[in-house]
């Protein structure tokens, strides 16, 4: 029997204490606070951080009474940044705020200063967004991305529940998976390499770090069937990672857009998600495109699917919709495109209604800002709901 041809593909993740992810979470916590009191809030909130300082800035038009400084400190504290030696002290760091109103030029073009009906609301900006799905995992997400993301989440879990008390908030993960290409569908064979770099305190040895990471992080996350004697482990390969968080590196909202999406699979239009209200199609367009791609794969029409949608500022209807099933479709892609167009409304105002995207509060968007926006469980992730598709099945 001929040996199966394989290839390697790698995805990375960072956990919630990474400086860029800290910024994503603060930006989305601000969005949550605005939407909780005023669902029509227009929010474009950026965050940056460096040693002993967090700044939030951008354009926000809202009736909500928002205490920006409290949101910053609460978010940092929730992640675990409670003293300078872990990278940031939530209660004593400088918090700078520079927020202005949304430009009236943008407001009149997008929502007519709140006068337009939902179906008339224009895209908040130009751009193109992608949604992707694959049948290789129950989440309809790439395995390399799922494992890297879950390792990051598990690192945080064992830090917060004190299983590994030497852990500090900052950390990164990376997983290389060996795949077989089955006529366009991706079939994971094994995990080739696992890389974890995590911030730690002064007391722990590198041997203890490696042993704890294998036992408490890798074992519970990566299914046994994917690990073998040839799997390579790089556990804190730099040898020392005591200084971390904003003390180690500056952080900025929107710097982790591949981690937020599909781990390098599919494609990305370049627009970040966090800190943006749903009239920003960077966010809402990517969410509806994911629902469309996932619904196609979950319905069995294709094993793998990417959907692209594009917009012009102020125009409700998308400029283009594109579908590619990588040769895995049971019917031609042009027919699948028609199914997508018939079953999904890509106008921003209608996406907002159909996915209930004005609902903030209860940390809804904050939850999305670490460990990925897609392949997640829970009622808040409305774009992960598989939509039953109306289509004429070909007769056998």
Curated annotation (Swiss-Prot):
Keywords: ATP-binding, Cobalt, Cytoplasm, Magnesium, Metal-binding, Nucleotide-binding, One-carbon metabolism, Potassium, Transferase. Binds 2 divalent ions per subunit. The metal ions interact primarily with the substrate. Can utilize magnesium, manganese or cobalt (in vitro). Binds 1 potassium ion per subunit. The potassium ion interacts primarily with the substrate. This is S-adenosylmethionine synthase 4. It is found in: Cytoplasm. Belongs to the AdoMet synthase family. CDD domains: S-AdoMet_synt (cd18079). Its cofactor is Mn(2+); Mg(2+); Co(2+); K(+). It is an enzyme of class 2 (transferase). PROSITE patterns: ADOMET_SYNTHASE_1, ADOMET_SYNTHASE_2. The lineage of its organism: Eukaryota, Viridiplantae, Streptophyta, Embryophyta, Tracheophyta.
């Amino acid at each position: 029997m001929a040996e199966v041809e394989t290839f390697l593909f790698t995805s990375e993740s960072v956990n919630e204490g990474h400086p860029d992810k800290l910024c994503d979470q603060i930006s989305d916590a601000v969005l949550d606070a605005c939407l909780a009191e005023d669902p029509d809030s227009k929010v474009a909130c950026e965050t940056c951080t460096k040693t002993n300082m967090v700044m939030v800035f951008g354009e926000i038009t809202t009736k909500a009474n928002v205490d920006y400084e409290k949101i910053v400190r609460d978010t940092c504290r929730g992640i675990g940044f409670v003293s300078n030696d872990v990278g940031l002290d939530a209660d004593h760091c400088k918090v700078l705020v520079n927020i202005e109103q949304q430009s009236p030029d943008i407001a009149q073009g997008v929502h007519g200063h709140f006068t337009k009906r939902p179906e008339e609301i224009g895209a908040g900006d130009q751009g193109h967004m992608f949604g992707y799905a694959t049948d290789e995992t129950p989440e309809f997400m790439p395995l390399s991305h799922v494992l890297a993301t879950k390792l990051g989440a598990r690192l945080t879990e064992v830090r917060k529940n004190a299983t590994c008390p030497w852990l500090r908030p900052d950390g990164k993960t990376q997983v290389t998976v060996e795949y077989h290409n089955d006529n366009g569908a991706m079939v994971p064979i094994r995990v080739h390499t696992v890389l974890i770099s995590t911030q730690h305190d002064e007391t722990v040895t590198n041997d203890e770090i490696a042993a704890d990471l294998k036992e408490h992080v890798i074992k519970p996350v990566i299914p046994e069937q994917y690990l073998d004697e040839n799997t390579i482990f790089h556990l804190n390969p730099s040898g020392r990672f005591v200084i971390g968080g904003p003390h180690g590196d500056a952080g900025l909202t929107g710097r982790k857009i591949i981690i937020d999406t599909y781990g390098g699979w599919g494609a990305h239009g370049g627009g970040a998600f966090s800190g943006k209200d749903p009239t920003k199609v960077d966010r809402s367009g990517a969410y509806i495109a994911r629902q469309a791609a996932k619904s196609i794969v979950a319905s069995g029409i294709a094993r793998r699917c990417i959907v692209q949608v594009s917009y012009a500022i102020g125009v409700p209807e998308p400029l283009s919709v594109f579908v590619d099933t990588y040769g895995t479709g049971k019917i031609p892609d042009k027919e699948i495109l028609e199914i997508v167009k018939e079953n999904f409304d890509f106008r921003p105002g209608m996406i907002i209604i159909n996915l209930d995207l004005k609902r903030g509060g209860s940390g809804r968007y904050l939850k999305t800002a670490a460990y990925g926006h897609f392949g997640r469980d829970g009622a808040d992730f409305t774009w992960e709901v598989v939509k039953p598709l109306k289509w004429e099945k070909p007769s056998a």
